[in-house]
Amino acid sequence: MTADNAIFIPPYKADDQDVVVELHNRFGAEAFVAQETRTGMPVLWVKRAQLKEVLSFLRGVSKPYSMLYDLHGVDERLRTQRRGLPAADFSVFYHLLSVERNSDVMIKVSLSEGDLNLPTVTGIWPNANWYEREVWDMFGIDFAGHPHLSRIMMPPTWEGHPLRKDYPARATEFDPYSLTLAKQQLEEESARFNPEAWGMKRQGANEDYMFLNLGPNHPSAHGAFRIVLQLDGEEIVDCVPDIGYHHRGAEKMAERQSWHSFIPYTDRIDYLGGVMNNLPYVLAVEKLAGIQVPQKVDVIRIMLAEFFRITSHLLFLGTYIQDVGAMTPVFFTFTDRQRAYTVIEAITGFRLHPAWYRIGGVAHDLPRGWEKLVKDFVEWLPKRLDEYTKAALQNSILKGRTIGVAAYNTKEALEWGTTGAGLRATGCDFDLRKARPYSGYENFEFEVPLAHNGDAYDRCMVRVEEMRQSIRIIDQCLRNMPEGPYKADHPLTTPPPKERTLQHIETLITHFLQVSWGPVMPANESFQMIEATKGINSYYLTSDGGTMSYRTRIRTPSYPHLQQIPSVIKGSMVADLIAYLGSIDFVMADVDR
């Protein structure tokens, strides 16, 4: 993308109603039911008969909603706080994002239990494919016309739909598990790849195709990830990514944890992102509760989040270069990560999974001596990045393996839901820290690194430059750390300030209930997205006025990034796929949740 055709991104305006006016003008106001939420976007319910027409209109409107950011479902049957909403046993939501407008809109449709089907929208947004499969997998909602509606998170032999409210949430609610020989053989046979089921031929006009399983146990697959390759020699004719091996039911877990006790579970999504995982969750809960955190909390959160951006990118850099054949850099990047973890551990008490952010603040104040630790790191890392750039990134073999490999443009990136460095490597200047500042990022000076070829090499270079910008942000946190409390003065802050419990019996009772049962959040919906280490990560929370989330939707960046693989890599060599997989920068917990 050149400067001549770069997308202009206007200033962000929450709850932008311009699209609502356009929809009313096109379909009539009576076609929609507006829902008041704290999501920061218009939320409109439509009838199933008009769903596809409405979505097609939004896809083709001036400054279109080019990205289907998310698509998922909700079991509405046990929800009590639904005043003013259409009757529904289940609902499906379509979260659309327009970079050109810098705004979002959410379209919802209600379904009755005896008629759980919708038309597919894979012809409008290609990345709807996996999302619709997951909705069928988790809720049993059918999508007519879908090219391959099958399990995606659960094994093919699984029975039931886990995110339904009548599906057990605990293993103890099932019969004891036993693996008989017959069951083992059934599971093994179900994992066998059938090319015809995916529309693939075993033979061409003059050749036989070979089908190769890469993974789910392969070092270049970066986790429990299987991709089946249809090969003509070493050329990739087609491929089928197969995910779900790392699925742990994170969204189901959120329905049986209190708002506070779910925080450690967020750390396990992108397990390299540390407190970066906590941030969208606690910000979304704070929106529900109406909590405004002190400025010091914002700055502390940003500083720690940028530390984890650096540690994640260092791991990416080492393993990426290793994937294309150089062994030495990975040892250096792992050693350098330890310098960052020394600072992180001194501040939070933990390394990879601190679970350190809290509803309304952070776990505790900064320790004595934190300034020197941060200052030493800020002064040291830029020199190391210079060494990596000179010794590794300018290496002719690395360039030969990655320049021009697995390239795509901005239009393709948006259609597949690609965000983060993968999007900015195409020249699209969309970084939420700038485009939609949260947690005080608007108070910091930094640049958004861009590239223009959208290939494997550019994705690497963007992340290296992002580390330099993270150092700038951390340095500003160091120099401008505000005084004040590390926790908000709000009744729903969790855990509440200890000093309030030492007054009389009523404060002790309140403290006990809030810590043991958890805070009661107002009935509403909230949403928060952030620029995480691997792209845009978000939490969409539904509260029914209780101590636990009614529905927690976790949208992760790695999920659509893997879905994009076949469209990018067809016609390339197997060696190019290895370079491409490394350049994506994903972890399977971020994909499978």
UniProtKB/Swiss-Prot annotation:
Main localization, broad class: membrane
The UniProt record lists the keyword Translocase: yes
Chain positions covered by the region annotation NADH dehydrogenase I subunit D: 208-593
Enzyme nomenclature, EC number: 7.1.1.-
UniProt cross-references to Gene3D superfamilies, sorted A to Z: Cytochrome-c3 Hydrogenase, chain B, NADH:ubiquinone oxidoreductase, 30kDa subunit
Membrane-protein topology: Peripheral membrane protein
Catalytic activity: a quinone + NADH + 5 H(+)(in) = a quinol + NAD(+) + 4 H(+)(out)
GO MF annotation, one: NAD binding
Annotated region described as NADH dehydrogenase I subunit C, given as residue ranges: 1-184
Keyword match Ribonucleoprotein: no
Oligomer status and interactors: NDH-1 is composed of 13 different subunits. Subunits NuoB, CD, E, F, and G constitute the peripheral sector of the complex.
Protein name, per record: NADH-quinone oxidoreductase subunit C/D
